[in-house]
């Protein structure tokens, strides 16, 4: 449909054909129509890190280096957090290696996965490497910027255990999806 000008230069009605809209101008949209249904994906943010972090047993919680930020457009929005956390495990001379992963929204812990990896690996210095997938739906009730991050901790007792996050520049990813509430 062509654009129709009614009442001078200030009142315009009609539909702009899709081919006439530059993708770059879509980023300038600041308001959403009231008719967006709940459950609609409003925005997606992804962060990737390849920075290696080494954690040894009895070292407490360690920041894995995986972090992402999002600014929800409404306080009723949910944030779906999708994580692919890379790690390599070495149990040393111990029989078992167990570690936990925690998810923080800013400084608040919002999720905790216990014994996310319980493995028996050789004690000859070899490693067991993998990516683990996690998900969490958050209700932050905020329109301010929110930062999510993961931390890890070896929970098996005794020394000689090591967890290496993003070892050898292997990527870990965090995807944040704002869902209309």
Cite the ranges covered by each PLM segment.
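Terminal beta-strand-rich extracellular "head" domains
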Residues: 54-56, 71-181
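Solvent-exposed, flexible loop/coil residues
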Residues: 16, 20, 25, 57-60, ...
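Short, solvent-exposed loop/turn segments enriched in Ser/Thr/Gly
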Residues: 62-64
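Glycine-rich, low-complexity segments
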Residues: 1-52, 181
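Extended, low-complexity regulatory regions
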Residues: 66-68
């Amino acid at each position: 449909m062509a654009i129709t000008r009614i009442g001078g230069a200030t009142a315009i009605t009609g539909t702009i054909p899709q081919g006439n809209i530059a993708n770059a101008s879509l980023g300038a949209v600041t308001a959403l129509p009231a008719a967006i249904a709940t459950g609609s994906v409003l925005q997606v943010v992804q962060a990737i890190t390849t920075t290696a972090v080494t954690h040894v047993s009895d070292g407490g919680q360690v920041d894995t280096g995986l972090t992402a930020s999002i600014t929800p457009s409404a306080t009723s929005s949910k944030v779906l957090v999708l994580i692919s956390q890379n790690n390599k495990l070495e149990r040393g001379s111990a029989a078992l290696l167990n570690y936990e992963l925690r998810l923080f929204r800013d400084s608040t812990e919002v999720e905790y996965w216990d014994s996310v990896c319980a493995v028996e690996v050789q004690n000859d210095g070899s490693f067991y490497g993998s990516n683990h997938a996690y998900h969490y739906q958050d209700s932050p009730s905020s329109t301010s910027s929110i930062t999510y991050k993961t931390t890890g901790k070896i929970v098996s007792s005794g020394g000689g255990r090591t967890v290496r996050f993003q070892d050898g520049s292997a990527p870990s990813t965090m995807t944040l999806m704002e869902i209309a509430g």
